[in-house]
Regions:
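N-terminal basic, amphipathic alpha-helical segments
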Residues: 1-130, 335, 339-346, 367, ...
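AMP-binding (ANL) adenylation modules
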Residues: 433-437
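Conserved core segment of the aminotransferase class I/II
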Residues: 302-371
């Protein structure tokens, strides 16, 4: 055993024995080198090895810390079977009942689609918004119509460039949140009655858009760890005249899955070979827990077939409703559809976010947000282990703020939703994530709020209800 491996094993034993607990800082490189009589390079090699094994993680300018994720005691949810038919979509009534459930401020919002506002820099944004409103040039009503505020588009393009993706700001269109971007993309490439490949389970807003546009869904199974099943998608592309594919490639809602880079590249190539556009919903991309943001599928697009959609709603400012789309070869058509519907998003909101991106410390905010979300995930996973049946299967995503739970087979998540709501707890039942209303024994839980005694009590109550089935 090499010296760095021996030192790594010594630290690993301290973690396994509980001497170094989850979230606790491990000795600094300098301290470890002096205390244990090893060179700094040996310590670095040991820590790198422990990081690869998932036992510790580095925080920029803070050192190394014990990973909050112990090896998961849960099995992964089972991958759904492929449905070999297209289907019309009718889920809105069910979705609206879930959305209504989170309006009561006294309800524990495990069914919400947003993180807590407490996690966002709202006072700093408010100052930017007030300044933008005071200084707004009346001519911006004309000059900042679609494609949107030039400074904001420039800032977004710069963030992509830092991540290694050269995305010209001329391709970027600012929208009223990502949902409008996704609507516009579908309208640009489909007609009523067309077939669209979607994930199963899929974000319910995707299903509602298909329902509104009178499109049919072809459901493709999703693996809880690495995303959409490419073999199933390839079969569907051979069998059906699919006009578009809509997928979340990073930290998918509701499962939390992220396609590895090679799989994203394969997805783009598969769709390119059939000349089918990919609508990439990438709204959770900034909420990664590791050291590096996942690369979007758009990075592998060479023919302009990927329509990449993003938003600040999940990472910075939910109420501002500012999103964007880089629509590739469809950019002009999408922009014209935008001009025919809502002209442009709020100009003060665009200017405020542009100012914050330039001056407000967005990356510092994101580091704090990611850390908070990862800690909250650990708290919810621990609560599930304490209170839920042993056969519960749980996803464990490396970003975002959702867990997908597959409960014992006899559990009816629609009844569970009503029973939990009567106790002041909102959840998202599985059937709202499927065009065919499958996943009856599954639920999605949101851990995007600071963990409190009320959160813990709600999980205990929820676990007790699940056990009653």
């Amino acid at each position: 055993m090499k010296r760095y491996e021996k030192f790594a094993e010594d630290i690993a034993e301290l973690i396994r024995s509980g001497v170094l607990g989850p979230g606790q800082r491990v000795p600094s490189v300098r301290y470890a080198s002096q205390t244990y009589g090893v060179s700094p390079s040996t310590v670095f090699q040991a820590y790198y090895l422990l990081e690869r094994r998932g036992l510790i993680r580095a925080r920029p300018r803070s050192g190394y810390f014990v990973n909050t994720h112990a090896p998961s005691p849960f099995s992964e949810p089972v991958v759904s079977e492929q449905v070999h038919e297209s289907t019309e979509v009718d889920v809105s009534e069910l979705v609206f009942s879930v959305l209504d459930s989170i309006k009561d401020p006294n309800t524990v919002p495990f069914g919400s689609a947003f993180p807590s506002p407490m996690l966002f820099p709202l006072p700093r944004l408010a100052r930017s918004l007030a300044s933008a409103s005071r200084e707004m040039d009346p001519r911006l009503v004309v000059t900042d119509m679609s494609p949107g505020n030039p400074q904001l588009r420039r800032q977004i393009a710069l963030r992509y460039m830092v991540g290694g993706l050269m995305l010209p700001m001329e391709e970027l269109l600012i929208t009223n949140g990502a949902l409008e971007a996704l609507n516009l993309c579908l309208q640009a490439v489909t007609e009523p009655g067309d077939l669209v490949a979607i994930e199963a389970p899929a974000f319910y807003a995707c299903l509602q858009v298909l329902e509104r546009l009178k499109l049919k869904a072809v459901e493709i199974p999703v693996h809880p760890r690495d995303g959409i099943d490419l073999n199933a998608l390839a079969q569907a592309l051979e069998r059906y005249p699919i006009k578009a594919c809509w997928t979340m490639t990073s930290f998918q809602n509701p499962m939390g899955a992220t396609l590895p880079e090679a799989k994203k590249q394969a997805l783009v190539e598969l769709l390119r070979s059939h000349q089918v556009p990919l609508i990439e919903d990438d709204v959770y991309a900034e909420l990664y827990y590791g050291q590096q943001a996942p690369k979007p599928a758009k990075a592998f697009d060479t023919e302009g077939l990927v329509m990449h959609c993003g938003s600040f709603a999940k990472s910075l400012a939910p109420g501002y409703r500012v999103g964007w789309v880089a629509a590739g070869r469809y950019a002009q058509k999408v922009e014209r559809l935008k001009l025919m519907t809502s002209l442009c998003p709020s100009m003060p909101a665009q200017a405020a976010i542009a100012d914050y991106l330039q001056h407000g410390g967005y990356d510092r905010h994101l580091r704090k947000l990611r850390y908070a979300l990862e800690e909250q995930q650990s708290a919810m996973l621990a609560a599930i282990a304490r209170y839920f049946p042993a056969q519960t299967r749980v996803s464990q995503p490396a970003g975002g703020y959702f867990l997908w739970l597959e409960l014992p087979e006899q559990t009816d998540s629609l009844k569970l939703f009503q029973m939990a709501l009567a106790q002041g707890i909102s959840i998202a039942p599985g059937p709202i994530f499927s065009a065919t209303q499958r996943f009856r024994n599954c639920i999605r839980l949101n851990y995007g709020s600071p963990w409190t005694d009320a959160s813990e009590k709600a999980m205990e109550t929820l676990g007790r209800i699940v056990r009653s089935f």
